[in-house]
A protein has these predicted regions:
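Beta-strand-centric surfaces of beta-sandwich/beta-rich domains
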Residues: 1-274
């Protein structure tokens, strides 16, 4: 088995929240001889100034008219800025999202990006696809809620987030959450726990884990530096995930462990097999 990879042309997502197709609004064609899309690795390409109190919070969607892909919507790592004349922005590591999409030979893939918050300076987004000539495991499907949620302002507030529905799922293979500040302020941090529950889980166990924390410094120009991971994700080995009912409604929650002047933006996401 041989591996290969290709990238799309980085494309602007605009300053609003409208979904944009990458590769300058064109599909990327999988090469002949490739049978499997192993994974996707999206990446930010900032080309303008970052703006105070404007974080990057972006969802990626993959679609094809040639092969079965959807649902395939997942969250990128968040990127935080700071307050007033902040001096630096920290880039998170690249995240790889397992796909294992079969029958990909010659298929046209459409890759979309969507900012879930507005930005004064439009971010650009690129994406790498990793290919193989053989199977690399069960196909992974991804989903998020349709819209973002806002966390609490009072310390220790447990916020109910928007739900995710899975149809014809066999097991959840990962659960994750992205939290980015709406407004950065000195000595005000994003810390806390994510929690996933459902009466459609076929096991009675808890699924709770810490978010990727980010901390703010002192002064009016406080930076709230991005966590190196940019998101928090719990992965389960194949065959050892969360077993599901044929149709499952997934609830999620975020508990903020520090007071916030303005609630942070929160988006859960997950992957599953069929």
């Amino acid at each position: 088995m041989t591996y290969s990879s290709d990238t799309v042309t980085p494309t602007t997502l605009g300053t609003g929240t409208t979904e944009a197709r990458l590769n300058t609004d064109s599909p990327i064609q999988v090469p002949d001889g490739i049978s499997n899309i192993v994974s996707a690795i999206p990446y930010f390409v900032p080309v303008g100034v970052f703006t105070p109190d404007e974080s990057y919070l972006v969802r990626v969607r993959m679609q094809s008219n040639d092969i079965s892909v959807e649902p395939c919507r997942f969250m990128m790592s968040g990127v935080n800025t700071g307050d007033a004349a902040f001096t630096s922005v920290q880039a998170p590591i690249l995240q790889e999202y397992s796909m294992n999409i079969p029958n990909a030979n010659g298929a046209n893939m459409n890759i979309y990006g969507q900012c879930l918050t507005t930005n004064t300076a439009a971010p650009f987004l690129g994406c790498e696809l990793v290919y193989s000539t053989g199977s690399t495991g069960s196909q992974q499907y991804w989903n998020t809620p349709d819209s973002i949620s806002t966390g609490g302002t009072t310390i220790n507030t447990r916020t109910t987030l928007n739900t995710i529905t899975i149809t014809d799922g066999r097991e959840i293979t990962s659960i994750g959450m992205v939290v980015t500040p709406t407004t950065a302020a000195a000595s005000t941090h994003d810390v806390g726990e994510a929690e996933f529950t459902s009466s459609d889980f076929q096991v009675p166990f808890p699924y709770k884990f810490p978010i990727a924390p980010s901390f703010s410094g002192l002064g009016a120009a406080a930076n709230q530096l991005t966590n190196p991971n940019g998101l928090s994700r719990q992965k389960f080995p194949a065959g050892h995930g969360i077993p599901l009912a044929p149709r499952a409604l997934i609830n999620s929650f975020y508990t903020n462990r520090d007071a916030k002047g303005v609630g942070s933006k929160v988006v859960p996401f997950l992957s599953f097999t069929r």
